[in-house]
UniProtKB/Swiss-Prot annotation:
The gene is ansB. It holds the Pfam family Asparaginase_C. One of its GO terms (biological process) is asparagine catabolic process. This is Probable L-asparaginase periplasmic. It comes from Haemophilus influenzae (strain ATCC 51907 / DSM 11121 / KW20 / Rd). Disulfide bonds join 100-128. Its EC number is 3.5.1.1. It comes from the Bacteria.
Length: 349
């Protein structure tokens, strides 16, 4: 289905001069599907199917990108990001590592549902200092007010800017640049859904330029110990959600299924009820790594506060939310099962 003219009109008037292709940076776009490649039957209805449009179609819809970079597209998968999995994560990381020397930057088109998890996984596993920028959309390409075309254009602006190098993996959405470790989706429907609630944005995109205000302080990319080149799978780590009167059966199901790590999405400062605490203590004694996080959207999960992590052998997630704590724990388990070493990973990365 053709993209609506209104969706593309948002790019008019950007005023980017046409440059000689030989003088432009080379940017590789790795496409995975998502709403940015979504298609619906109506331009005024939010019903659509994700991942329908090819990377070639997305590139053709935003010809202005060719004024700022030489664009090459590669279709990795065509899925909604609710179906994102370890296999695709590994494929993306390996593709970026393999092509790092032959391109000046990468853009990854991705669904917004799990974008923050993919971004953080790549932040920990990509061994390349060149820009890696994830981008998506909250409205499908066929909707009248589609945000995807301008988001994609801006992502290329970010990837083509040398100032983006060395900042870790980035997310470019709605004129903002956000760091992979801190960014999270905050609204199910709003265009301005991505925020970094603990630390704020890294910078902003305006009139085809990036204005950076800060860089991430945590270690990333080339400064992590995680090498995925020989991996074809990741350790099994599950998340258990805490709430009033929460039963232990879901936790038992994961442990009985052989999960090597458990992340607790606790209440408040990562707290769980007495039954959960008892079961998690037993799991830790059986060499299952337990990480305490919180379902609360901002703040720290503090080590040795209400829960004596040192006594139980638990790991505290700091400012990582449960879904990102799971990502780091999966990678940590490829290196060690020592909770003291893993605690240091959570403080460093």
């Amino acid at each position: 289905m053709k993209l609506t003219k209104l969706a593309l009109c948002t790019l008019f008037g950007l005023g980017v001069s046409i440059a000689n292709a030989a003088d432009l940076p080379n940017i590789t776009i790795l496409a995975t599907g998502g709403t940015i490649a979504g298609s619906g039957q109506s331009s005024v209805n939010s019903a659509y199917k994700a991942g329908q449009l090819s990377i070639d179609t997305l590139i053709e819809a935003v010809p202005e990108m060719k004024n700022i970079a030489n664009i090459k597209g590669e279709q990795i998968v065509k899925i909604g990001s609710q179906d994102m999995n370890d296999e695709v994560w590994l494929k993306l990381a390996k593709a970026i590592n393999a092509q790092c020397k032959s391109t000046d930057g990468f853009v990854i088109t991705h669904g917004t549902d799990t974008m923050e998890e993919t971004a953080y996984f790549l932040d920990l596993t990509v061994k390349c200092e060149k820009p890696v920028v994830l981008v998506g959309a909250m409205r499908p390409a066929t909707e009248k007010s589609a945000d995807g075309p301008l988001n994609l254009y801006n992502a290329v602006v970010v990837a083509a800017d040398k100032k983006s190098s060395g900042r870790g993996v980035l997310v470019a959405m709605n004129n903002e640049v956000l760091g992979a470790r801190d960014v999270t989706k905050t609204s199910t429907t709003a265009v301005q859904t991505f925020h970094s609630p603990n630390y704020g944005s890294l910078g902003y995109i305006h009139n085809s330029k990036v204005d950076y205000e800060r860089s991430p302080e945590s270690k990333h990319t080339i400064n992590t110990p995680f090498n995925v080149e020989k991996l074809d799978s990741l350790p099994k780590v599950g998340i258990i959600y805490a709430y009033s009167n929460a039963p232990v059966e879901p936790l038992n199901a994961l442990l009985n299924a052989g999960y090597q790590g458990i992340v607790s999405a606790g209440v408040g400062n990562g707290n769980v009820n007495a039954a959960h605490l008892d079961r998690l203590e037993k799991a830790a004694k059986d060499s299952v790594v337990v990480v305490r996080s919180s379902r609360v959207p901002t703040g720290y999960t503090t080590r040795d506060a209400e829960v004596d992590d040192s006594k139980y052998g638990f790991v505290a997630s700091g400012t990582l939310n449960p879904q990102k704590a799971r990502v780091l724990l999966q990678l940590a388990l490829t290196q060690t099962k020592d909770p003291k070493v893993i605690q240091q990973y959570f403080e460093d990365f």
